[in-house]
Amino acid sequence: LRLLTADFFPSEGQAEILGYSFGNGDITGLRKQIGIVSSFITERLPKHMTAEKIVLTGKFKSSILYKAYGDKELQEAKDMLISLGAGELIGRQYHGLSQGEKQICLIARSLMEDPDIIILDEATVGLDLFAREKLLRQIDRITLLPHAPLVLYVTHHAEEITENMDHILLLRQGKIVAQGAKNDIITPEVLADF
């Protein structure tokens, strides 16, 4: 995943993502095209900010608001929360949110630059059953956005694969075990070997 977000480079072979070739020029533009929700992002975010300001940090690809922003940018962050069905989080302190509410803030944050891809790495970890189901519904809403990004959803739980997820890649110890259309991969036969 860190390779996909251009945090690491391949140690062998070549990688090309969204037209950017690693090792052949500047790839800083790639980072703007990929949003990510992961524990390594969560750990860097300040807890004292409101939900919409946490979302706004995604516009600057930073864990803090070090650049000046105006009412327009802050309204964009609020609108992003509303578009994901989480308008009730506006004005609330991030540190006081439930784990599921924090995750939806991070998903909204990942969408602030209108990315082509968002990576959701174990997005439901730490959630109870009801919070998990609510978050999965909100993730499905992303596909309804005007410029819906490709959603790369990483999980260890097949039951988290939603209706709108259509392609599956199964890995075991970093190696591809199976890949293809969801209906071809999520079968008792394939999952029994996994």
Positions of the model-derived regions?
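Helix-to-loop junction immediately C-terminal to a conserved catalytic motif
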Residues: 5
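Conserved ABC transporter NBD signature motif
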Residues: 13-24, 30
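Conserved ABC ATPase "signature" region
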Residues: 56, 71-89
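Conserved ABC ATPase signature
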Residues: 93-97
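Catalytic Walker B motif of ABC-type/P-loop ATPase nucleotide-binding domains
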Residues: 118-122
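H-loop/switch region of ABC-family ATPase nucleotide-binding domains
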Residues: 155-156
